[in-house]
Design a protein with these regions (language model features):
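Residue-level signal for alpha-helical context at structural boundaries
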Residues: 108, 191-195, 232
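HotDog/MaoC-like acyl-thioester-processing domains
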Residues: 1, 71, 76-166, 237-291
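Hot-dog-fold acyl-thioester-processing enzymes
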Residues: 1-71, 136-226, 290-291
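Small beta-barrel nucleic-acid-binding modules, principally OB-folds
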Residues: 64-79, 226-236
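Generic signature of intrinsically disordered, low-complexity segments enriched in small/polar residues
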Residues: 21-31, 44, 89, 109-112, ...
């Protein structure tokens, strides 16, 4: 495609206090002055100087062709702040032609978005898109094989002790997030659009919302910790009304620059269906945490 190395138009983004409150609500997170870690995804999506629809057109695809977010990673170099200006720069890092038994031929396109505040790096968001090269709607059935579970490690899970109760995906919050993301994809808003594309019979939850649920789980397991890295693979669709459950394990602890860091493997499931997310989170523990 000749896109690898292509630099995207730069731009800027800002999260106003009221938008920060709305984003916390859309991400099933208690409101607070510090933005949710996955707000970096939102700032990158809104701040890059090209719309999401035009980005997919650059890839030779339309929204209705079923482009999907397959993977996403967020690296936070410093805590995000509301009411702050962020410069956003982006580049297409790689393009790979692949084939799946489920969606046929597709292009795996990796884009990196760098956020700067006051000229200093603030966050890096790397998104991997699956762009189907079959007729419209084929890409919507994207799934990947889940990884193996690992036992015998410190266990994390969603539920009352980790996330304040069961998470049920709310279509109203999906609409709020569509506005905050400037995401025009109708499958997040309209069940008829999802059916028309052969996706599902209900609206489809946005990838960053599913990522935020995973982030909430690990943050609840370590009160007062700060999430500095979240790497996820989105394995299946989460639909409006779904109940989402999660779990994970602590796989490593280290002292870096005088701070204790915990690395966790995480996953999310929709009961009765396949696993929908697997990933890894790194948290910096508060100095008073003696676990």
């Amino acid at each position: 495609m000749g896109l690898a190395g292509h630099r995207l138009p730069p731009g800027s983004a800002r999260l106003e206090p009221y938008q920060n409150w709305l984003l916390h609500d859309a991400f099933y997170s208690p409101p607070g002055p510090e933005p949710h870690p996955v707000a970096a995804f939102v700032l990158a999506n809104r701040g890059i100087g090209i719309s999401l629809a035009d980005l997919f057109r650059l890839f030779g695809s339309e929204i209705d062709d079923g482009p999907l977010l397959a993977e996403s990673s967020i690296e936070l170099h410093r805590p995000l702040a509301e009411d702050a200006d962020y410069e956003v720069r982006g580049v297409v890092e790689s393009v790979e032609r692949r084939r799946s038994r489920r969606i046929g031929p597709f292009d795996r396109i990796t884009c990196r978005f760098d956020l700067f505040s006051g000229g200093a790096p603030a966050a890096t968001v790397t998104n991997v898109f699956a762009i189907p090269r079959e007729p419209k709607g084929r890409g919507a059935v994207w799934t990947e094989e889940r990884g193996t579970s690992d036992e015998g490690r410190q266990h994390l899970k969603s539920g009352p002790e980790a996330s304040g109760g069961e998470i049920r995906v709310d279509p109203a919050r999906m609409k709020t997030l569509a506005l905050l993301l400037a995401d025009p994809n109708p499958i997040h808003l309209d069940a008829a659009a999802a059916r028309r594309l052969g996706v599902a019979d209900r609206p489809v939850n946005q990838g960053p919302s599913t990522m935020a649920i995973a982030a909430n789980m690990v943050l609840a397991a370590f009160p007062g910790a700060r999430l500095v890295s979240l790497r996820t693979r989105l394995l299946g669709l989460v639909l409006a009304g779904d109940s989402v459950e999660g779990g994970g394990s602590v796989v490593d602890r280290e002292i870096l620059d005088g701070q204790e860091r915990v690395r966790c493997q995480v996953h999310l499931d929709v009961p009765g269906r396949d696993r929908v997310l697997e990933g890894e989170a790194v948290l910096v523990l508060p100095a008073s945490d003696n676990r």
